[in-house]
Amino acid sequence: MIVDYAVMASDDNELYLDFWLPVSKLWKERIGVTPVLLYFGEGNPSEEYGIVVKMKSNKNLPLATCWARYWWAGQQEDKVTIISDIDMLPFSSWYLTEQVARFDNDKYIHINPCIDTYSRLPSCYHIASGYSYKKALQLHDNFQDSLDYLLSQRYDNSTCYIKGVGNDKWCYDEYHATELLLKYKDLIMVNRIGGQSGHRIDRTDWTYDIDKIKSGYYYDSHSIRPYKQNKDAIDKL
């Protein structure tokens, strides 16, 4: 299995969109994977390092941006896509691509399946071909049809929902994908060394060891935000 694309999504919210340029550069130049931004907005994000796919405006933001990543990946047929978050800085090509090279393209991989600590599969780090995404997640050909089906589901997301964030269906993308994938025979869960946030520089504890950066110890960083206010610290990293 060779990863072709890394897909992420955003609307015009600067809290997320501002990460596109630095994150796309990391995916392209450090990891060697083509980054794709599914953009629900009115501007023109840079395509210097990746592909921008303009999506129709949607009343169901931000859930639409979350689910769009699965849906777009499912349209890529024999191409392999890794789903990522736009504020997740990728550092390790071994963790993100090389360790899955041993698997056949008909498998569906998750490289951080922390159900024991997170209660579900995170949207970040699903890896599969378009055929596998479509089959495993029962994706429609039309994005709005696929989103409407997701919205028709009922999940207890009380542990996910945060007042003022998203809506009453926040995290439905993760609950729905998890429900379907746990029944899918070709799912392979590759445990992350150190658990859910192992080998990660996390915004909840923004400290790191420079020698470990140089040695390739860190897989990724869930970045501090917003980017503009923290640009110097993020760019230094």
Where is each model-derived feature located?
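N-terminal anchoring/stem segment of glycosyltransferases
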Residues: 1-58
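Hydrophobic anchor at the start of a short beta-strand
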Residues: 33-35, 81, 187-188
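A structural signal for well-ordered alpha-helical segments within the folded catalytic domains
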Residues: 18-21, 25, 71, 171-179
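The conserved acidic donor/metal-binding loop of glycosyltransferases
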Residues: 85-89
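Catalytic core and acceptor-binding pocket of nucleotide-sugar-dependent glycosyltransferases
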Residues: 131-237
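A conserved donor-nucleotide-binding helix/loop in the catalytic core
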Residues: 57-82
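Conserved donor-nucleotide/metal-binding helix-loop-beta segment in metal-dependent transferases, i.e.
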Residues: 90-122
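Short glycine- and hydrophobic/aromatic-rich loop-to-beta-strand nucleating segment
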Residues: 119-134
